[in-house]
């Protein structure tokens, strides 16, 4: 943390901190310290299918939830089912997390289905990658999600296509 000079003296605006289920408490402490230095903070809970009740209790009791721009749920091994993802979102919403996001891997070909589930549940954001490039089974292919969203009036999709229209043309 000491290597981060503070947002006013840095070119970095935000920091996304990833943590394994056994490091939640330490990660939340780091998040608080970096927030105090002026950074926007995102925390990514990796391997969400293996967060136990103790991990959820730590998340529930944390008193600084409001400092997070978003709390990411990462399906690190691409094995979570849409039903289990829904249960995870409900636990986090019940614990008063406002902006919950999703980062899916496609090992079981569920990245698209899980991302659509997260969107239905009110996800703040879902991660996509070009051609689904990513570790292991890859991540959600941007074209797959954008093709589906193109058929619906997704409120943020138009903003995305307007801002990146030239890139999409290429």
Language-model-detected regions and their locations in the chain:
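Catalytic cores and adjacent flexible loops of soluble metabolic enzymes
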Residues: 1-170
């Amino acid at each position: 943390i000491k290597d981060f000079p503070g947002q006013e003296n840095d070119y970095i605006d935000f920091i996304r901190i990833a943590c394994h289920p056994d490091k939640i408490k330490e990660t939340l402490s780091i998040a608080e310290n970096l927030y105090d230095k002026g950074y926007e903070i995102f925390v990514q809970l990796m391997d969400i299918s293996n967060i136990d009740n103790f991990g959820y209790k730590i998340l529930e009791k944390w008193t600084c939830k409001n400092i997070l721009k978003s709390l990411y749920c990462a399906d690190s091994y691409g094995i979570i089912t849409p039903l289990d993802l829904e249960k995870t979102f409900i636990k986090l919403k019940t614990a008063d997390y406002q902006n919950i996001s999703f980062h899916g891997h496609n090992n079981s070909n569920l990245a698209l289905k899980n991302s659509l589930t997260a969107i239905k549940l009110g996800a703040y954001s879902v991660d996509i990658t070009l051609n689904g490039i990513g570790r292991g089974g890859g991540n959600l292919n941007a074209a797959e999600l954008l093709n589906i969203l193109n058929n619906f009036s997704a409120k943020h999709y138009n903003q995305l296509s307007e801002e990146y229209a030239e890139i999409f043309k290429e």
